[in-house]
Swiss-Prot record:
Residues 1-11 have a biased composition (Low complexity). It catalyses: a 5'-end (5'-triphosphoguanosine)-ribonucleoside in mRNA + S-adenosyl-L-methionine = a 5'-end (N(7)-methyl 5'-triphosphoguanosine)-ribonucleoside in mRNA + S-adenosyl-L-homocysteine. The record marks K95, K101, R126, H176, E264, Y333 as: mRNA cap binding. S-adenosyl-L-methionine binds at K74, A92, D114, D150, C151, Q172, F173, A174. SUPFAM superfamilies: S-adenosyl-L-methionine-dependent methyltransferases. This is mRNA cap guanine-N(7) methyltransferase 1. MRNA binds at N70, N71.
């Protein structure tokens, strides 16, 4: 076993304790350099450039069943942990693809933030029902606020003081963008902790570092992949060794057909868990996507949800299903749930709803300077 990472695939067992040395100055300052800001902007520009697809275009995607599987995983997480009237904070909310999932959970209030201006505008029009999205749904039942800014850099507790505390925070397929530096990782977790109520939950999905590193070490070169994805590491990782004392800023280039083509960063889960504990966020579970599917497909209600979403076909007319390459790509990801220490007093802050609106104009979007 090489230093810093386990060679075994992810499991639901708690990861080992972190062996990296924490920032001795704690989280008193989160300083960003220009290189980090440029990386964040590059990622934002990538997602802003992605246009909304029609239903026909979406169904023709070479990874349509992988997308549906990921939607199923997010839907299951939301159904497991969201309660009626919950206040939700959606970090890196993108184009609002999860709005309908939250609506079905009958939440009471929604705040979404994303760094990409184009994505936030698409989210606004989707929420308003102005765009002809494939959901064909015109009205959501909860008031909302939208913010445009880098949630891994700005202090959100000051900006959202009147909206907090939140019952649930979600960050789907984006947490790894905070792992460029320890400062950004700390800011991300500090924001989550500061805005969650005691007993509140943080749900998310992100790349599984154990799987990626295992595949890299099994490969002949510095690239892994198949017909739907590839991952390429730089020559600085030619020895395929990663120091446990330097778990931030481990960059690779990730390409996923019809979805992603930009730099990403390894998140060693043992470090993520240890850092989260510093911010009073305790691990409830972590599961690789394969394990997640096998476990929750044992429950009839989630089997029916899978059928409706069509990731494995609909069981009748649509006999298509995930390809072997899509299933392998799914193995690259994990789901996690953290809970903030403490017990909630059970009180609901109905006043926070006044900060949201049922229809959002462009002027209603709050732009946050980094």
């Amino acid at each position: 076993m090489k230093r810093g990472f386990s060679d075994s695939p992810s499991s639901s067992a708690p990861p080992p304790s972190s062996r990296f040395k924490s920032n001795p100055e704690g989280d008193s300052q989160f300083l960003e350099d220009e290189t980090t800001k440029n990386f964040a902007r590059k990622v934002a520009d990538h997602y802003s450039r992605r246009t909304n697809q029609t239903l026909e275009e979406r169904e023709a995607s070479p990874i349509i069943h992988l997308k549906k599987l990921n939607n199923w995983i997010k839907s299951v997480l939301i159904q497991l942990y969201a309660r009626p009237d919950d206040a939700v904070l959606d970090l890196a909310c993108g184009k609002g693809g999860d709005l309908i999932k939250w609506d079905k959970a009958r939440i009471g209030y929604y705040v979404g933030i994303d760094i990409a201006e184009g994505s936030i505008e698409d989210c606004r029009t989707r929420y308003n029902g102005d765009a002809d999205h494939h959901q064909r749904r015109k009205k959501f039942s909860f008031p909302s606020r939208l913010l445009c800014g880098d949630c891994f850099e700005v202090e959100l507790d000051k900006i959202l003081e009147e909206d907090a505390p939140f019952d649930i925070c979600s960050c789907q397929f984006a947490m790894h963008y905070s792992w460029t530096t320890e400062a950004r990782a700390r800011r991300a977790l500090a924001n989550v902790s500061a805005l969650l109520r005691p007993g509140g939950v943080f749900i998310g999905t992100m790349p599984d570092a154990n799987v990626i590193i295992k595949k890299l070490r099994e490969a002949e070169g510095l690239e892994i992949g198949n017909s739907v994805y590839w991952i390429r590491f730089g020559e600085e990782y030619s020895q395929k060794k990663f120091k446990s004392s330097s778990p931030f800023g481990i960059e690779y280039v990730f390409h996923l057909e019809d979805a992603v083509d930009c730099p990403e960063w390894i998140v060693p889960f043992n470090v993520f868990k240890s850092l989260a504990e510093e911010y009073d966020l305790e691990l409830v579970f972590v599961k690789n996507s394969h394990e997640f599917v096998h476990e929750y497909m044992k429950k009839p209600e989630f089997v029916e949800l899978m059928r409706r979403l069509g990731a494995l076909g609909d069981g009748s007319n649509d006999q298509s299903t995930l390809s072997a390459d899509e299933w392998e790509a799914a193995y690259l990801y994990l789901s996690f749930v953290l809970r903030k220490r403490g017990e909630s007093d059970g009180a609901r802050r109905s006043g926070r709803r006044k900060n949201g609106k049922m229809n959002l104009s462009k002027d209603d979007v709050l732009y946050i300077d980094s």
